[in-house]
């Protein structure tokens, strides 16, 4: 059935491409963000800026309808329903929960979906393969190299013998990297404790618990729930002498010691390029490969490093064998 749908969708997209080629110059794009955090907001800003630039360069107009569901599934479903009712030409889903909801709502409607910052599109069954997604959806992935983050933890502190794993158990983006972290630590013979939270209050309580348990370091993947709480927990962690290693530079911006991962500004630009290719050039999402990125940049918060008694230059030297670049940042609420 899914293969039949893919064939039918390909025909539909081909017909749509013909219509576009006949002179359509205005496209309605519905963008939904999952939650208000530095990384996701940076993605949205770069999608909008790049679409505006591409439109100006090529004589087309993108009418953007931007919404944020603030992690509320009922609001998310209503946003998507409104996009469909308003006859958008394409939807952009920022983060895994939004992409999954959009795919579910649009498969029969034939509306193309481009996702942004989906950590594991295969495990969540958004796509059949990264090379050929197989339906009306494709996009960009911020897949995290968990072993690399683990390597950085032990490069900074070879004697660490208890690691805290802090995440939201309901976040699909955390499932694979947390499993990978456990496997890494098991193989290394290092103990770990799990701490979870589904909102800011619960995350603060989880952080207090890991401080009380005296872990040597904390790992969080690209988890949007923990991201929204980082500004509320980073000072307590630093005061307790516990470094927080994470899967995105926005965590470091908000006070974590380290964020390791993709360049989200570039991810937003590439996402916009894919939107343009589908709408203007008639590219078929079913055979448009998911874009992945080098996530070898380690972003160190120098203020937090100082609070922990760590020297940035020494950290950079220790991290160098395990990443392609080490850069510094200071604490702020959002990227400039």
Which residue stretches match the model-derived regions?
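Hinge/cleft segment of the Venus flytrap/periplasmic-binding protein
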Residues: 277-336
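Short beta-strand elements in bilobed, periplasmic/extracellular small-molecule ligand-binding domains
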Residues: 54-73, 136-137, 184-200
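An alpha-beta-alpha
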Residues: 29, 47, 138-188, 284, ...
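Pocket-lining segment of extracytoplasmic ligand-binding domains
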Residues: 172-244, 248
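Beta-alpha junction/loop-to-helix N-cap segments that form part of ligand/metal-binding clefts
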Residues: 65-128, 223-247
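Extracytoplasmic "Venus flytrap"
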Residues: 28-54, 65-74, 170-174, 223-228
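Short, low-complexity disordered leader/linker segments with a strong preference
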Residues: 1-28, 53, 57, 333-336
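Hydrophobic alpha-helical segments within soluble ligand-binding/sensing domains
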Residues: 120-162, 262-283
